[in-house]
């Protein structure tokens, strides 16, 4: 089981029926196929259980997990530039004239097409967890762009997907700043030793702290000077560690060994049973963490 490393959280903005059986059919029309000789990139769905299953969806207790794979061809720009330059010089020598810009652009396309079949591929996978009980969608992505790209593929596959980023009643950075300033955190949360503080003004400074006592006078001075806490490392119930950002994303999730070891009694050879047990454990813990975080940060914005 792949334990999520990051979470971008989205709210289903209206009731939608997301049945795994129906989704299976819809996703299969957009299943992953590798790049052809002239493709720069391809994205599609693969089984979240890897080679252990052909199913594109996996559901347990109303929690659905799916996985998008992306293949990108790697063509380093210096290689393209050199190949293009060689071609331009050869043609200009043969024709005894300078090539026009349109001709050079056309040559660049030719160069790309000739290099593509020989290019290496880079693959990445993005897992997406749909919590049909709480009407939330979580993407294991460190950037909003990657999360949005994955949601766009899901929207295309399903026909529509009414989701918005989870938004809170109060600006997150104001709440985080108050936690550090007052040296008081909500029940269940403990401060760790990492943070980012930013000046309110756009051209103001940014301070990134690691292995730092965040309740120290040094940090207090920065807050008094008007800096806001925009990232904060937290420990939740000694079960999950994370870095919470002012955009609501959860990065660098780290599950406690005591948590991850709970299913050690299940034989690793029984992949399906272990996958289910780990998925149930991970989603129940993360759902509880998200619920606690929303409450601690002042509640969800009412639209």
From Swiss-Prot:
Name the source's superkingdom.
Answer: Bacteria
> Coiled-coil regions in this chain?
none
Keyword DNA-binding in record? no
Q: What is its main location?
A: cytoplasm
The protein's UniProt keywords, in alphabetical order, are: Cytoplasm, DNA recombination
Gene Ontology cellular component terms for the protein in this record = bacterial nucleoid; cytoplasm
Example GO biological process: DNA recombination
Q: Does the keyword Mitochondrion apply?
A: no
Compartments, as annotated in UniProt: Cytoplasm, Nucleoid
Q: Which residues cross the membrane?
A: none
| One Pfam entry name | RdgC
Q: Which GO terms describe its molecular function?
A: double-stranded DNA binding
The record's listing under HAMAP family reads:
RdgC
Q: Which family does it belong to?
A: Belongs to the RdgC family.
Q: What does this protein do?
A: May be involved in recombination.
Q: Would you tell me the protein name for this molecule?
A: Recombination-associated protein RdgC
Organism field: Yersinia pestis
